């Protein structure tokens, strides 16, 4: 059983997946920092020195000064500012993955085109299989053509 697990764990795609998960976790931290520390502060400044992560809709009748205070009190809230931050995180990650996949696809060699499976009968212009020796439509002999 141990040797079977070793074979499974050392297969190429399992190791690739493990590396991808580790790199993805590190990339997630970079994207979070990019959104929270680089993009959102200037955006908040442009719309009036607003911290997006503290935007929320209070569903209780008691007013609270901040999202943290409302959550600490157990008040029901809709934290749409955090949602906006997470949405921006997702868009950045999705765009980065798109660029990565696009580049990898460019590096892959293009497969050779498949040979045609049909040809045109020179007599009646109908489509017939490439291997046909006689046209099914006009019964012309197609072997002389080859």
UniProtKB/Swiss-Prot annotation:
InterPro entries: Mechanosensitive_channel_CS, MS_channel, MSC/AndL, MscL_channel
Primary location class: membrane
Chain ranges passing through the membrane: 14-34, 81-101
UniProt superkingdom: Bacteria
GO (cellular component) term, any one: plasma membrane
Cellular compartment(s): Cell membrane
Pfam families from the UniProt entry: MscL
Keywords recorded for this protein, A-Z: Cell membrane, Ion channel, Ion transport, Membrane, Transmembrane, Transmembrane helix, Transport
A GO term for molecular function: mechanosensitive monoatomic ion channel activity
Membrane topology according to the record: Multi-pass membrane protein
Subunit: Homopentamer.
Family stated for the protein in its record: Belongs to the MscL family.
Function description: Channel that opens in response to stretch forces in the membrane lipid bilayer. May participate in the regulation of osmotic pressure changes within the cell.
Name of the protein: Large-conductance mechanosensitive channel
Species in which this protein is naturally found: Symbiobacterium thermophilum (strain DSM 24528 / JCM 14929 / IAM 14863 / T)
